[in-house]
């Protein structure tokens, strides 16, 4: 038997009437009330046990969780969820996009869920501030755009992360990087090289930054700086996580990435990790890298290593009018290694290049490719002519080895 939206809403109102609003009730207490009411309703309507259980789950999620989104959030194989108004919900599973058969019962219910998401992280979203980035309790990143900025209805984009963050061994197993290249990066991190990770949307930058951070020695003091906290550093006891704050209509001032970088440098860090450079804070990141904070890590959106350098120049100019040669000199002296990630046609994510910034000459930054991902089709008129050979190959050697030598590491085999 199919229960109508109207009947579900009435049942929900009966359950709400039973909830004691004078105190905070636990999930167990709420679930018990839901179960009791659904049991009575199920007997009256001759529901099958499976139908009653599905109804209980739906009502509990609508009261205590994130309504129809909760089932998608609980599925470990789903990586992204997109809500386009109350009627349309899409999700990405195993690299493919699907439309959900679920929808919100009304625009009001969608807005209730939006307020719940924003409020859980002390963020405010309303007509005065209709766009907000936030995160869920499980670490998922959320972007919200309210109607009428989102013309066809309020939009939500959720990027999920695994409960247990990927370590480099996972990425090797998924063939995102070779064991040899991963070992090379491990030595670079241990030696205190400043590393910048670039890639397009969904290329795995945050995941890779997590994996790189795994190599940081346990005893070092690490400060992470993010718009919305996403990094999940494992077994790092001396870790301080900083997160930006938006301004609101009550006069609370914003706290920006730039503010947090300046604060972090006064906190005696061994390493500063900036989740993503998007604007004028790029200048502060470069200055941190150039003032003795070796081993710093960050990421940025770009289509290649060269494109990342151009974008960094533009971002620095957002914060201060500096001559281009001065900016390029800062980049060349601050960043040691560029790692570029990409998403392939088969939806897999790969490390496409590991490149050293080798120097700065005649107003140009000199790049030295060390590893590069190659994709070659087999020769025609052979048995394997439709086969594509894909592998990461070593194409050069590290030029600047001073940090590695000071840290006591040998280049043999790297």
Where in this protein do the model-derived segments appear?
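N-terminal accessory targeting/assembly segments
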Residues: 1-125, 136
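P-loop NTP-binding catalytic core
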Residues: 75, 88, 92-191
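Switch/coupling sub-region of P-loop NTPases
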Residues: 193-195, 211-334, 340-342
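The Walker A (P-loop) glycine that initiates the GxxxxGKT/S ATP-binding motif of P-loop NTPases
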Residues: 199
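Walker A (P-loop) phosphate-binding loop of P-loop NTPases
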Residues: 202
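Conserved lysine of the Walker
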Residues: 205
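Hydrophobic positions on the alpha1 helix immediately C-terminal to the Walker A/P-loop
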Residues: 208
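NTP-binding/hydrolysis catalytic cores, primarily Walker-type P-loop NTPases
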Residues: 347-414
């Amino acid at each position: 038997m199919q229960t109508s939206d109207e009947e579900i809403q009435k049942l929900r109102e009966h359950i709400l009437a039973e909830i004691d609003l004078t105190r905070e009730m636990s999930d167990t207490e709420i679930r018990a009330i839901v179960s009791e009411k659904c049991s009575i309703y199920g007997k009256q309507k001759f529901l099958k046990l499976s139908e009653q259980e599905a109804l209980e789950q739906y009502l509990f999620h609508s009261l205590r969780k994130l309504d129809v989104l909760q089932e998608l959030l609980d599925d470990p194989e789903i990586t992204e969820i997109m809500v386009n108004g109350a009627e349309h919900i899409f999700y990405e599973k195993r690299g493919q996009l699907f439309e959900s058969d679920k929808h919100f019962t009304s625009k009001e219910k969608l807005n209730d869920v939006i307020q719940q998401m924003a409020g859980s992280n002390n963020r405010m979203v309303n007509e005065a501030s209709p766009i907000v980035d936030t995160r869920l309790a499980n670490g998922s990143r959320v972007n919200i755009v309210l109607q009428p900025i989102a013309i066809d209805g309020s939009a939500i984009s959720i990027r999920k992360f695994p409960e247990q963050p990927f370590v480099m061994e996972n990425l090797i197993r998924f063939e995102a990087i070779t064991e040899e290249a991963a070992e090379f990066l491990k030595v670079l991190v241990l030696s205190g090289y400043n590393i910048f990770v670039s890639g397009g949307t969904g290329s795995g930058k945050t995941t890779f930054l997590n994996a790189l951070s795994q190599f940081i020695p346990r005893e070092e003091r690490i400060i992470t700086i993010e718009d919305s906290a996403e990094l999940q550093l494992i077994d790092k006891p001396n870790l301080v996580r900083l997160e930006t704050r938006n301004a609101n209509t009550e006069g609370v001032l914003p706290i920006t990435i730039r503010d947090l970088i300046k604060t972090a440098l006064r906190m005696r860090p061994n390493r500063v990790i900036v989740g993503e450079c998007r604007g004028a804070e790029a200048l502060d990141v470069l200055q941190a890298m150039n003032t003795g904070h070796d081993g710093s890590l960050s990421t940025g959106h770009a289509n290649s290593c060269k494109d990342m350098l151009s974008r960094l120049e533009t971002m620095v100019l957002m914060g201060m009018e500096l001559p281009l040669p001065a900016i390029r000199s800062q980049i060349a002296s601050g960043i040691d290694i560029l790692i570029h990630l990409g998403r392939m046609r088969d939806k897999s994510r790969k490390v496409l290049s590991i490149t050293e910034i080798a120097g700065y000459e005649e107003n140009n930054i000199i790049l030295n490719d060390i590893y590069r991902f190659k994709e070659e089709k087999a020769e025609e008129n052979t048995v394997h002519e439709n086969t594509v050979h894909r592998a990461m190959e070593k194409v050069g050697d590290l030029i600047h080895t001073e940090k590695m030598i000071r840290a006591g590491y040998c280049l043999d085999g790297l």
